[in-house]
Design a protein with these regions (language model features):
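Conserved strand-to-loop turn within each blade of WD40 beta-propeller repeats
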Residues: 4-7, 44-47, 87-91, 145-148
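Blade-level signature of beta-propeller repeat domains, shared across WD40, Kelch, NHL, RCC1
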Residues: 127-156
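Active-site lining segments that contact anionic ligands and/or coordinate catalytic metals
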Residues: 38, 47, 71-73, 82, ...
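Loop/turn segments within WD40 beta-propeller blades
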Residues: 33-39, 44, 77-83, 88, ...
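Canonical WD40 repeat/beta-propeller blade segments in eukaryotic WD-repeat proteins
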Residues: 27-34, 70-77, 123-133
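A surface-exposed beta-alpha-beta supersecondary segment
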Residues: 62-85
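C-terminal transmembrane module of eukaryotic multi-pass membrane proteins
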Residues: 85-94, 99
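Per-blade loop-tip surfaces of WD-repeat and WD-like beta-propellers in eukaryotic adaptors/scaffolds
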Residues: 7-29, 52-62, 68, 96-114, ...
């Protein structure tokens, strides 16, 4: 069982062995996404940082930056093939980073003008709160949900 919390500690509980491993990352943790291999964890933090962590020894394998996340919980994910880290941010953008190099591959911002909330309050910032990679490897898609109530489906 893995947990991340506002104290900035990634905790791994081994229920069978009765053990707890803790890795201190210093900034509040907002999202955890386990790798398919079971030995890595994508950790998102309020310091506008995503970290790919090695669960065996607690080392950081890669760091992803260039987005804004300082106040809200923005869920991040990895694509099905684990080639990209994807996440929204507090400016309403969707970002993707290469998981091996850590380089930003792209960022995009959808048109929120169709949202009822945006029409009522066009100057209120929109945060992309949830990002999820689609399960179909043949047609990779990403679904995002924003604070204005919109859901967008993105294709590569």
């Amino acid at each position: 069982v893995h947990t991340g919390s506002v104290d900035g500690v990634l905790r791994t509980y081994d229920v069978r062995m009765g053990e707890l491993r803790s890795d201190t990352l210093d900034e509040p943790i907002t999202s955890l996404t386990p790798g398919k291999d079971g030995v890595t964890m994508l950790v998102s933090q309020l310091a506008s940082t995503h970290r790919l962590m090695d669960l065996a020894d607690g080392t950081q394998l890669q760091c992803f930056r260039g987005h804004s996340q300082t106040s809200f919980r923005c869920h991040s994910d990895m694509t099905l093939d684990e080639a990209l880290v994807i996440s929204g941010d507090e400016t309403g953008h969707l970002f993707a980073w290469d998981i091996l190099s850590g380089r930003k591959k792209w960022d995009a911002r959808p048109d929120f003008r169709g949202s009822a909330r945006h029409r009522r309050a066009p100057n209120v910032p929109i945060t992309m709160l949830w990002t999820e990679a689609g399960p179909d490897a043949q047609d990779p898609q990403v679904v995002t949900a924003s604070s204005c109530g919109t859901v967008h489906i993105w294709s590569r």
